[in-house]
């Protein structure tokens, strides 16, 4: 297990309104944030891990430290505006692999493959981003804000399709997902989950017991 410590600090404001808030709600200053997690970053037995918790609870900060040299992946970033999705995904890769990835995550509307990413719907953008990750098939990937902007029905099918497709990839590839929605736990069936709200890390067996 790898110990990850998050220490975030900002200015402690002493304005009238800040003082009123502290007094009325018995709130602390809010300038210090500390989170300690013991996570299986260096272990190879798992395929999909999940860090879940409310916004501002340290998920992204943990993700940035999880694997040395690995940055957070934004599914919506880095798409060219002058190329259709089918050309933008793994441009040097196999055509059939790209179309299979698009279909596997539920982006089966072929005309959407011929549009640039920025004109797609929110749900289509998520699926296209997921298909790009699957096509690139990195040994390790950390996906930030997983399903965060999606309608939950769309998120359900998208998350299930991605998790199923990821587990089909060859080799022991590992994917860490960061999400503010607990409903994804049921849909992706992670091998382990860390909840920033409780500070607990549970494996799949413990999750089933709970």
Predicted segments, located by residue:
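Conserved catalytic loops of ABC-family nucleotide-binding domains
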Residues: 161-181, 185-187
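Hydrophobic anchor residue at the start of the ABC signature
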Residues: 130
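Conserved ABC ATPase signature
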Residues: 116-125
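Pre-NBD coupling/linker segments of ABC/ABC-like ATPases
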Residues: 1-42, 80-81, 210
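H-loop (His-switch) and adjacent beta-strand-loop-beta switch element
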Residues: 180-209
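ABC ATPase nucleotide-binding domain signature region
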Residues: 41-107, 181, 186, 198
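Walker B catalytic motif
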Residues: 142-154
């Amino acid at each position: 297990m790898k110990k990850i410590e998050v220490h975030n600090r900002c200015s402690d404001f002493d304005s009238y309104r800040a003082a009123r808030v502290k007094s009325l709600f018995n709130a602390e200053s809010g300038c210090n944030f500390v989170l300690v997690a013991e996570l299986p970053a260096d272990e190879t037995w798992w395929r999909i891990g999940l860090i879940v918790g409310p916004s501002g609870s340290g998920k992204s900060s943990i993700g940035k430290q999880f694997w040395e040299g690995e940055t957070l992946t934004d599914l919506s970033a880095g798409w060219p505006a002058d190329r259709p999705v089918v050309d933008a995904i793994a441009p040097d890769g196999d055509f059939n692999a790209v179309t299979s990835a698009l279909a596997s995550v539920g982006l089966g509307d072929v005309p959407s493959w011929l549009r640039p990413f920025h004109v797609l719907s929110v749900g289509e953008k998520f699926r296209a981003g997921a298909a790009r990750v699957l096509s690139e098939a990195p040994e390790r990937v950390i996906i930030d804000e997983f399903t965060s902007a999606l309608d939950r029905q769309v998120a359900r099918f998208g998350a299930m399709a991605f998790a199923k497709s990821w587990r089909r990839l060859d080799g022991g590839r590992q994917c860490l997902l960061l999400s503010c929605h607990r409903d994804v736990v049921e849909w992706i069936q992670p091998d382990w989950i860390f909840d920033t709200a409780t500070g607990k890390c549970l494996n799949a067996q413990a999750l089933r017991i709970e």
